[in-house]
């Protein structure tokens, strides 16, 4: 009891410090004049407008399908919102025009726009994501073997990772998913004793930097990496299941409380009912219909889940996932241990997190399926990792015996 109370106090202190830091950083980011960035912002909006020549004003890359869509409309809103346009620093920092989100990306993007164009920012995005992608793949190969590295990388590629650098809206959650995974994979010895704080902070950072895009990516990938580390360390079913559930709860609390805090801070600083807007949007995104030019579209859990499954598991993705499951299944049958099945089930549970998200946020998941489908890459990685976990103890013991003999 005392241990849980202490952890709760640490998380509360972490949240308070994070909220103060977020608010201060946003105020600082909007403190310098628009003239410093107006030329680059104008050029960015012009480029996004030129690209957005598809139906609905969105831009498609490569395949000209909903699978590969980039949200240029929201990207234009992101770049236009970097300008104060006569607003006070406080109103601009709280984004009174779109107040229900933190818009933490402005802390990075606004200073960068002083010296960089949108083209150079996209190059920077690409280099950052590819560097983290390679680091995570290498560490998976080093720790768990080449098959796990293939599952990690393959799941992300199946979600069209390559398009993320070109869409500023997709960058924060993709970057945080990879950065969180890298923290777990590269710093496991230090992170394993602070996992609750790590996942709580990760959820908070996703809320701060991201719109409501595909947040489960930044929960599922780091969590699956952490659970695999625990399996390889010889942890039993009870601690692994405990971590599966409690780390997920910590992430959700970090995300949810940070979102509520934006409502409180925004309301206090701008004297607008930001909290009311957040609560009404939360209610709208979890239930009800949405409206198009042709009328109302009814939303159900089933329709939200199905449209995301149909978008993700198309063509090559079906074959790639089936091949990964087949290869891992053969290895599990030949070299696995059935007593590992409770640990494997914990990873299989993580594979269901995107589906649970679709059911809870059914309106958002149905309306924005062309980006929320990306969360199913968690299903690919965690599902294959569940089979991988069946053979972990035997392989780990063999490695240990070799090391002792050496």
Specify the residue positions occupied by each region the protein language model found:
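Membrane-lumen/periplasm interface segments of specific transmembrane helices
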Residues: 29, 244-328
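Juxtamembrane segments of multi-pass membrane glycosylation machinery
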Residues: 104-125
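Aromatic- and kink-enriched transmembrane "portal" helix at the membrane-lumen/periplasm boundary
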Residues: 107, 153-176, 203-208
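Transmembrane-helix motifs of polytopic, lipid-linked glycan transferases
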Residues: 126-149
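Hydrophobic, aromatic-rich transmembrane alpha-helices
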Residues: 133-137, 314-341
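Transmembrane alpha-helix segments characteristic
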Residues: 151-153, 338-362
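Membrane-interface alpha helices of multi-pass inner-membrane proteins
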Residues: 195-223, 243-257
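Hydrophobic/aromatic-rich transmembrane helices and adjacent perimembrane loops
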Residues: 367-389
